[in-house]
C-alpha cells in the first residue's frame, strides 16, 4: 500500500499504523521468523484480503521450556525481510525481548488459557507453552489492532486457544485459520524441518503418511476414534526411529477428546525424530461441503442457488434476504440510516427466520415473527440495502447468524462475500457474473412482471452500477471474487444451463459414496 518499513519499536509500529486511514483494513501475520512457504501462504492471503499487511517476527522466550530449542531456533532476518518485501508486506515488526517485555518475564502479566484447551495434545508435554503463546499473541494483537489475523492450521491447538481467548476477551479481530502447506513429499512445512538430516527427513514422512492412512479409513466409513488411532499407530510402528509423543482425536474447536466423529474431528500427532519434535494434523469432516455462490446484483444468484440446492439436497441460505429484512426493519421503524450504533443496536434484537419450501419462489422471510417476504423486495429496500449491508456492525451480526446456520454443513449460500468472508472454507465456490446491461435488463423485466414500472431500464442500469461500486468499496468485507472461486458468466445462458453446470461441478468434486 505504501513504503515498506522494518520496525523494531512499539512506538515506530504504532506511528506507522497511525498513518493509515481509519477505513483501512489491516491483516496481521505473527511469526517467529525463519519464514517458509507456509508463512508465505498466510501473507499472500492477508495481502489479497486486506489493505495493509503487517508481519511480526519475534522468537518468544515465554513459550519455550527450559530444555527446548530457544537458543538454536532458526533465525534468518535478512532473508525474511527480503521475502516480506517480495510478498508486498507493508510493515515488518521485529522487536527485541526487552522491547516487548521491558520489566522482564518473572513479574509479567500473563494470559492463562482455559485448562481444558491445554491439557491435551502439545499442552501435556509442554507445560506453560500455551500460556506463553496466548500472552504474546494477545499482546501483539493489542499493539497492531488488526481486522484479521492469520494462523496456520498446522498449529491447530494454538489456533483453537487463540480463538477462544479472543472470544472470551471480546477482542475486535477475526482469527483466520489457513490450510497446512506441505512439501511435494507430504511433509508439513516447519521452520524446524531444517534441523533434520536427509535420513531423519525420510523418517519424518511417517507422520503425514500415518494421517493419510487414517484419512483413507475415514473415507471408507471408519468414524471410531480407537480404530482411527490404531491405523496411525500401526503405521508408525514401522518406523522405530520415530518416537511418538501423542496421537489423539479431538474436537477442533473445544479440543475435547472424541470417541467417535459425529460431525468433525481433528486427528493430531506429534513425534520426535532425533532431537527434533514435529507436529501434524488433519481434519476428518463428515459434514456435507458448503456451496458458496457469490456475484453482483442481478447475476441470478438467488434463483440459481435455490435450484442447485434442491438438486443437491442442500439447505438454501439466502443471505441477501437477511440483509433486505433488516434494511426493511430499519425503514419501517424510521431509524436514521446514518446512525450506525442505533441501527446495530436495533438489529441485534431482531429475530430472523427463513424458509425456502419452493425452489422456484423467493425465500420466505420473517423478522420478529412478522412475515416480510414481499415487503423486503420493494424498490425502497433495494435502494437502501447496500447502505445498511456496508455497516460493519450489521455485517458482523448477520455473519454470526449465517455461520451458525452453516456450522453443520450441507448448505448452499449466496451473497457477495460468502466465499471470501462468511464461509472461506466452503468446499465449492462459484463466482456468478453477468454484464451490468444484462443484469439491468433482467431486473427491469422482473419489475415489469410484478407490475412495478416506476424505473426505466437506464435508471436501473445506473442503480446496478452504483451498487456494484458501493459493494466493492465498502471497508468491511468488500465484494470481490475469492481466489479459489470458479467463475461462471451467465450472459446468454439459461437458468437450467447454469444450474446444471454448478451441480456438475459439486458432484464431480464431492462424489457420493
Swiss-Prot record:
Residues 283-513 are annotated as: Cytidylate kinase. GO terms for biological process: nucleobase-containing small molecule interconversion; pantothenate biosynthetic process; pyrimidine nucleotide metabolic process. The keyword Transmembrane helix does not apply. It catalyses: (R)-pantoate + beta-alanine + ATP = (R)-pantothenate + AMP + diphosphate + H(+); CMP + ATP = CDP + ADP; dCMP + ATP = dCDP + ADP. GO terms for molecular function: ATP binding; CMP kinase activity; dCMP kinase activity; pantoate-beta-alanine ligase activity. Its EC number is 6.3.2.1, 2.7.4.25. The active site is at 39 (proton donor). HAMAP family: Cytidyl_kinase_type1, PanC, PanCY. This is Bifunctional pantoate ligase/cytidylate kinase. The gene is panC/cmk.
Amino acid at each position: 500500500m505504501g513504503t515498506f518499513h522494518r520496525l523494531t519499536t512499539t512506538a515506530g509500529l504504532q506511528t506507522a499504523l497511525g498513518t493509515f486511514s481509519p477505513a483501512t483494513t489491516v491483516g496481521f501475520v505473527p511469526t517467529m521468523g525463519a519464514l517458509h512457504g507456509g508463512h508465505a501462504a498466510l501473507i499472500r492471503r492477508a495481502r489479497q484480503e486486506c489493505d495493509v499487511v503487517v508481519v511480526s517476527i519475534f522468537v518468544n522466550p515465554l513459550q519455550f521450556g527450559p530444555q527446548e530449542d530457544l537458543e538454536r531456533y532458526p533465525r534468518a532476518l535478512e532473508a525474511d525481510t527480503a521475502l516480506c518485501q517480495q510478498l508486498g508486506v507493508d510493515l515488518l515488526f521485529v522487536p527485541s525481548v526487552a522491547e516487548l517485555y521491558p520489566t522482564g518475564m518473572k513479574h509479567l502479566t500473563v494470559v492463562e488459557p482455559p485448562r481444558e484447551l491445554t491439557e491435551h495434545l502439545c499442552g501435556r508435554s509442554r507445560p506453560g507453552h500455551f500460556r506463553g503463546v496466548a500472552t504474546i499473541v494477545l499482546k501483539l494483537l493489542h499493539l497492531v489492532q488488526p481486522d484479521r489475523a492469520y494462523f496456520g492450521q498446522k498449529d491447530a491447538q494454538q489456533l483453537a486457544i487463540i480463538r477462544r481467548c479472543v472470544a472470551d476477551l471480546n477482542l475486535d479481530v477475526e482469527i483466520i485459520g489457513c490450510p497446512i502447506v506441505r512439501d511435494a513429499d507430504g511433509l508439513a512445512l516447519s521452520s524446524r524441518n531444517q534441523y533434520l538430516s536427509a535420513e531423519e527427513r525420510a523418517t519424518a514422512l511417517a507422520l503425514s503418511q500415518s494421517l493419510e492412512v487414517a484419512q483413507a479409513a475415514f473415507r471408507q466409513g471408519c468414524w471410531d476414534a480407537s480404530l482411527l488411532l490404531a491405523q496411525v499407530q500401526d503405521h508408525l510402528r514401522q518406523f522405530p526411529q520415530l518416537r511418538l509423543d501423542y496421537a489423539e482425536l479431538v474436537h477442533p474447536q473445544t479440543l475435547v477428546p472424541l470417541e467417535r466423529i459425529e460431525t468433525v474431528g481433528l486427528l493430531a500427532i506429534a513425534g520426535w525424530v532425533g532431537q527434533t519434535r514435529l507436529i501434524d494434523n488433519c481434519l476428518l469432516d463428515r459434514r456435507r461441503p458448503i456451496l458458496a455462490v457469490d456475484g453482483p446484483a442481478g447475476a441470478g444468484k438467488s434463483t440459481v442457488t435455490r435450484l442447485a440446492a434442491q438438486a443437491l439436497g442442500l439447505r438454501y441460505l439466502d443471505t441477501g434476504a437477511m440483509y433486505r429484512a433488516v434494511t426493511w426493519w430499519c425503514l419501517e421503524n424510521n431509524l436514521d440510516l446514518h446512525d450506525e450504533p442505533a441501527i446495530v443496536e436495533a438489529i441485534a434484537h431482531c429475530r430472523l427466520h427463513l424458509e425456502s419450501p419452493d425452489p422456484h419462489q423467493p425465500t420466505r422471510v420473517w423478522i420478529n415473527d412478522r412475515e416480510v417476504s414481499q415487503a423486503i423486495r420493494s424498490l425502497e429496500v433495494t435502494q437502501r440495502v447496500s447502505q445498511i449491508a456496508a455497516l460493519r456492525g450489521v455485517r458482523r451480526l448477520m455473519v454470526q447468524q449465517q455461520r451458525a446456520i452453516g456450522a453443520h454443513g450441507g448448505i448452499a449460500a449466496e451473497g457477495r462475500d460468502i466465499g471470501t468472508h462468511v464461509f472461506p472454507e466452503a468446499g465449492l465456490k462459484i463466482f456468478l457474473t453477468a454484464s451490468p446491461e444484462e443484469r439491468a435488463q433482467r431486473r427491469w423485466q422482473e419489475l415489469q412482471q410484478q407490475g412495478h414500472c416506476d424505473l426505466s431500464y437506464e435508471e436501473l442500469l445506473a442503480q446496478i452500477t452504483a451498487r456494484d461500486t458501493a459493494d466493492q468499496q465498502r471497508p468491511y468485507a468488500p465484494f470481490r471474487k475469492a481466489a479459489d472461486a470458479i467463475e461462471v458468466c451467465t450472459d446468454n445462458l439459461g437458468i437450467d444451463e447454469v444450474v446444471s453446470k454448478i451441480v456438475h461441478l459439486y458432484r464431480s468434486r464431492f462424489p457420493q459414496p
